[in-house]
């Protein structure tokens, strides 16, 4: 199932997000769900945000919550700030630490996007 998730990422396309999100939500194996969270972060499609937020808040595995928080930070969307701030209160330290890293990444991306030279180079 991990390999299948990776193959979907390699094939690419926003239409694959729904399938990876289903794996993140429903798979019984925390390693597979962790891989799905990582994959959604790497894909960086906005329709991956809600499944990652849900996993950050609700997955029973600290391992998955940690990866979902990191993935949200990688995506760099301001929309996830509240979810990450709430994750600072997670009962597990690795999740709290991941939220700190993710929030730092959001701040970095925000500052970078305000840089005129960077904006010209990236078309934004």
Describe the residue ranges of each PLM region.
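Acidic (E/D-rich), amphipathic helical modules within compact regulatory domains
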Residues: 2-10, 22, 28-35
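Amphipathic alpha-helical scaffolding segments comprising HEAT/armadillo-like alpha-solenoid repeats
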Residues: 13-25, 45-57, 77-89, 108-122
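Short inter-helical turns and helix N-cap capping residues of alpha-solenoid HEAT/ARM repeat scaffolds
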Residues: 28-29, 60-61, 91-92
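Long, ordered, amphipathic alpha-helical scaffolds
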Residues: 73, 78, 97-100
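TPR/TPR-like alpha-solenoid helical repeat scaffolds
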Residues: 99-108
